[in-house]
Amino acid sequence: MSKRAFNFCAGPAALPTAVLERAQAEFLDWQGKGLSVMEMSHRSDEYVAIAAKAEQDLRDLLGIPSNYKVLFLQGGASQQFAEIPLNLLPEGGVADYVDTGIWSRKSMEEARRFGTVNVAASAKAYDYFALPGQNEWRLSKDAAYLHYASNETIGGLQFDWVPETGEVPLVVDMSSDILSRPIDVSRFGLIYAGAQKNIGPSGLVVVIVREDLLGRARSVCPTMLDYKVAADNGSMYNTPATFSWYLSGLVFEWLKEQGGVEAMAQRNRAKKDLLYGFIDGSGFYTNPIAVDARSWMNVPFRLADEKLDKPFLAGAEERGLLNLKGHRSVGGMRASIYNAVGLDAVEALVAYMAEFEKEHG
């Protein structure tokens, strides 16, 4: 096999090489059955076992309590922006939302189609370079839930704390930092995560929902979007994204082999410390995010002169450092260093950044 590049894409993101190699080995003939997972009936004993193991491994990794359902759904995280209010926001009700960047705003804008949204807090006052402390939040008295994004992939802000909401269910978009460090699932009413960053391939979204929040869907909620229907049918009300589910299960196995979420947190800390440390020590590269709000997963940075962006990216690609261009809405650079991106990738990136600075600084 030719040498694999270091992939810093924000999503679809890097997958563990060992996982891809196993999927490759099983692609034509899954465990001697003479067919691919992509050709299996989702109702077959073999596939039901694949799905059940994936769920159990995820439960083990995150310590998911028994009173939570784990759903493997289609539509990605963006579909959840509508699915959440359809299931949790009653007619005439209000939901609290925290605005920390593009993705949290998108979820907020979608929720407004279904009811009243109270912007409980916003990072706008800090130009989205810092998070508003909870003492600044203005929560509704009778909110159906409070929604926030734990990590903003574009802006590079991440919560290192869990909001306190009392009896109000806490709903979180963890698309880009789930499984990157330990969490207490019991603090949340609902967790959702698009798969294509830290879980597996695109086309799948994982929803972890407390059982008491099921059965609240509005009468106009499509059957396909009703969490209770999904839970009652084992995420198989219709044909699921079978291959994405299977491959995500292989990622969960790999994570357990690596030592679980605690071990990944140690690796991720080392990666982000190396990259931020280099940026902060440089007079050539900058990251504007407040230190206590910096993302472990998505590191945006700028060069001293934006005219150097194109040669920087060209040189990076020549060295097998791919997908470092920042999001089109903000520009600059962005290194996404999810679980499957090793320390060796970050070391190679830092070495190139130092070389480029020496030549152009």
From Swiss-Prot:
Pyridoxal 5'-phosphate binds at A77, S78, W103, T153, D173, Q196, N238, T239. It comes from the Bacteria. Pathway: Amino-acid biosynthesis; L-serine biosynthesis; L-serine from 3-phospho-D-glycerate: step 2/3; Cofactor biosynthesis; pyridoxine 5'-phosphate biosynthesis; pyridoxine 5'-phosphate from D-erythrose 4-phosphate: step 3/5. GO terms for cellular component: cytoplasm. HAMAP family: SerC_aminotrans_5. Disulfide bonds: none annotated. This is Phosphoserine aminotransferase. It is found in: Cytoplasm. Its EC number is 2.6.1.52. Keywords: Amino-acid biosynthesis, Aminotransferase, Cytoplasm, Pyridoxal phosphate, Pyridoxine biosynthesis, Serine biosynthesis, Transferase. It holds the Pfam family Aminotran_5. CDD domains: PSAT_like.
